[in-house]
């Protein structure tokens, strides 16, 4: 579960909070290390923080979340009685003739879909934060489903995003 500030805690496990994942703390140092060892940033992540199947689970959940939200048309829980709009945005995108407008509508639909699933109490990936839980899933979904990027490419991109998040934190 999230304890805020980008940190998570697994019930029953000892906390690794405060433990450095990487030996370098500045992007300049990481880039120099990668250049000296002829490696990509995602390879650097693998070297110090092998994520294995975990990143696949993250990606699968992001895709499942967007797919789920695109199917729903109900009202979100709470006193505001907000109507879900992701499915409607996706339908507008499907009818759109302009490629640029279609792309914008699809990205909005996917982001709303994940955010609406979050607001509706579904399981979501809340990275980098709960408030922006629609951003990364929408991009992962779009690049995989619409642009045909491979799972490996997206997985490596998520690793690099995590590296940057770790540097910023």
Q: Each predicted region: which residue ranges?
A:
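Mobile "lid/hinge" segments at catalytic clefts and subdomain interfaces of large enzymes
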Residues: 1-53, 57
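Accessory "access/gating" subregions that flank catalytic or transport cores
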Residues: 49, 53, 57-167
């Amino acid at each position: 579960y999230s304890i805020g500030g980008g940190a998570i805690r697994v019930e029953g496990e000892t906390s690794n909070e405060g433990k450095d994942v990487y030996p370098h703390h500045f992007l300049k140092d990481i880039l120099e290390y990668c250049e000296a060892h002829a490696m990509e940033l995602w390879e650097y992540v693998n070297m110090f923080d092998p994520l294995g199947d975990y990143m696949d689970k993250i990606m699968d959940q992001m895709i499942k979340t967007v797919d789920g939200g695109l199917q729903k048309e109900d009202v979100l829980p709470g006193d505001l009685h907000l109507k879900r709009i992701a499915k409607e945005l996706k339908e507008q995108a499907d009818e759109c003739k302009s490629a640029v407008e279609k792309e914008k509508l699809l990205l909005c639909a996917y982001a709303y879909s994940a955010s609406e699933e979050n607001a509706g109490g579904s399981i979501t990936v809340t990275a980098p934060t709960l408030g922006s839980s629609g951003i990364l899933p929408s991009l992962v979904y779009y690049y995989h489903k619409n642009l045909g990027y491979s799972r490996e490419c997206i997985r490596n991109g998520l690793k690099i995003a995590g590296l940057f998040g770790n540097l910023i934190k």
